Amino acid sequence: MTHPVVRFAPSPTGRLHVGNVRTALINWMFSRGQQGKFILRIDDTDLERSTAEHEEALKVDLTWLGLTWDDSFSQSHRFANYDAAADKLRALHLLYPCYETAEELDVKRKIAQTRGRPPVYDRAALSLTAQDRADLEAKGRKPHWRFKLSGERVEWNDLVRGPQSIDTASVSDPILIREDGSYLYTLPSVVDDIEAGITHVVRGEDHVTNSGAQIEIFMALGGKAPEMAHTPLLIGADGAALSKRIGSLSMGELRARGYEPMAICSHLAKLGTSDNIEARATLEQLCEEFSFSKIGRAPARFDDNDLNALNAALVHAMPFEAVRERLITLDARAASEPFWLAVRENCTFVADAISWVDMVYGSPAPLVAEEDREFISGAAMYLPEGELTTESWSAWTNALKAATGRKGRGLFMPLRKALTGAEHGPEMSAVLPLIGREKVLQRLS
């Protein structure tokens, strides 16, 4: 295989969310795994909705995820290229003007459906004479422009779906240019793919039906159609569409909630594949494990619980230096290596460490049941002498077990509740030296 050249083409009209990040990630893993090239194309032909702020935000999101790009360009700087391509198609009699209004087209669709025919455009505009067109324009009508499909069957081997074909006689000639002269997605995308040397187009399966027309436009413009891979769309754990949750699943929102970039990437890389959903420490590992052959045909279920589990697994393994600056920002008291190592396995997010600060450095209210009061008040005399270490908890509880006959939960739980004010938490062997002898004695008294 030659080194692939792929592109991720977001529109700067909103924040990146898990759906389009998954597309970016699959493109990135495939290209990087084959020593290829990953291009970021900004699809900003919608000048009214596209903003510089959203473009900057999506670049920040991709950088945060580690999905760096080799080249980048914006479609808004390339209108002359699209105009030239449109002129070429006109010269080939493959781009023709149509004057129907949206209402008239809707009536045509409804009539076709009532007659049991597919709602395919009838190409009435091809019958217009030059005088007909002049008369319509004199009445204020402005044309939209359609690409004339061949009517033949277009075939390709999809890297995910296998052999695919589209009968272009069964679909409408696609509109490439609107009445106001602005371009729809199709023509600029094909022009850019040809000029950027894109070898593989990887996108969601909602684009499958567009592929036949796009392949014919590639051929008409003298280009070679890239290989294609159409991946199943994401759905929620309940099987419902994610569209209503997209705001809460934006990269900005997930980052603010404390998710690690590699948790998100691990989750999205493994969703809908034959691999187990497990955390990976680096993008390079994900690249090594990626293959289109692993992607299934069923919709991929995005489950918050899986994402939380992956995030927790990564947090549990994080060394102190990886989180030091974040802990300082959250609460300087938490920014010590012994504290982090003691609490990290009780954290789903790095910020969860702060919930354990008061247990160690504050004054939590002891929880002492009436039947445990005598045991707790007498426990102090068995506390090992000198500075407390990670070995002190075991020595202390063994001494208490021998002296009182208590064992198991009846021994450990009253001590934990008296010292931390909680029934659950980090390992007491790590917590005891953090609390320190003086505070341990205070909390037992």
Swiss-Prot record:
ATP binds at K244. This is Glutamate--tRNA ligase 2. Its EC number is 6.1.1.17. It is an enzyme of class 6 (ligase). It comes from Hyphomonas neptunium (strain ATCC 15444). It comes from the Bacteria. The gene is gltX2. Coiled coil: none annotated. A motif ('HIGH' region) lies at residues 10-20. One of its GO terms (biological process) is glutamyl-tRNA aminoacylation. One of its GO terms (molecular function) is tRNA binding. It is found in: Cytoplasm.
